[in-house]
């Protein structure tokens, strides 16, 4: 079936580019081209009444159309960026994702994020966090322009032609989470207060901007490590234009949590739900006293611990021949299907094996052209675990499975 083959080729291209740590805009343009082809095929198939192509389910017409339009938008945008002086910058696929492009300030490319902390009512437990971008790329009729975003006591803004265009207003959350109408903004080694304690607290003619010294004369605040929003649920859904302080909305709150080594991630929680994110395995709903507004920082969460075997090395280490020999499985077949299987195994069956490799191929006598099928190698603690894995995990029939044992001479 020609459509199924074209779909498989487009998905194979996407998987290859997703696994490739590229900073080249040309690779990202190819990725969105493959994404565009995939959703165009889905749209045509759904129009004909098909619900699947091969083993791949076909999304609804609306979903396929929206995904195709997003891919076309990003493909054209990156082609335009490729012709600009900024094409020489290192652009990761995450930097040019459609989700980040639409995140506030919307319809801009953004890099180098940092976290701004806001404390309401002078209560260290009543705080929330916002994302600020050191580099904001705006496409205008005159070409691409590089600007920055910043924070003050009013909110977070983008500098556009010497004026501040706010895309986040702290007063909105102060009405929801505070009682006194006061808050403190901490941006790296700068602090701003609202309302100002005196006329001297006004900076640049804007009320409430109290900037503390950058040197040793005043308190400093070390900025948290950058955290990048990867999906619309982690971004504040608002546009690039200025905001009306009287406008209210129900937005998601973003919580940074500290991992080992001091690294931080963003975990999003709704105002009325438990924390949800890639690290939350068990969350407890919080209760609020009737006389106090909900605190943005009042939700607790636990770090999820991926179940792994006791035979595992420390994180990041891999020893194929620990103990002298290792029972394994080789799974071979269509590269895209093998990659999809590996993703499913890591997501749903992580406790059933020891380690799993990336997808690899044999190469020809010259160059790096791939030959044969895509292959993954799965290792186990012993043959019993391997037998349990093969007996409980469903593997597509078109993929071949070989039991092998690797040992030293």
Curated annotation (Swiss-Prot):
Phosphorylated. It is found in: Host nucleus. SUPFAM superfamilies: E2 regulatory, transactivation domain, Viral DNA-binding domain. The keyword Amino-acid biosynthesis does not apply. It holds the Pfam family PPV_E2_C. Residues 192-251, 269-315 are annotated as: Disordered. Residues 1-199 are annotated as: Transactivation domain. Its main location: host cell. Residues 325-409 are annotated as: DNA-binding domain. Gene3D superfamilies: 3.30.70.330, E2 (early) protein, N terminal domain, subdomain 1 (1.10.287.30), Papillomavirus E2 early protein domain (2.170.200.10). One of its GO terms (biological process) is viral DNA genome replication. GO terms for cellular component: host cell nucleus. Residues 276-292 have a biased composition (Low complexity). GO terms for molecular function: DNA binding; DNA-binding transcription factor activity; nucleotide binding. HAMAP family: PPV_E2. Plays a role in the initiation of viral DNA replication. A dimer of E2 interacts with a dimer of E1 in order to improve specificity of E1 DNA binding activity. Once the complex recognizes and binds DNA at specific sites, the E2 dimer is removed from DNA. E2 also regulates viral transcription through binding to the E2RE response element (5'-ACCNNNNNNGGT-3') present in multiple copies in the regulatory regions of the viral genome. Activates or represses transcription depending on E2RE's position with regards to proximal promoter elements including the TATA-box. Belongs to the papillomaviridae E2 protein family. This is Regulatory protein E2. It comes from Bovine papillomavirus type 5.
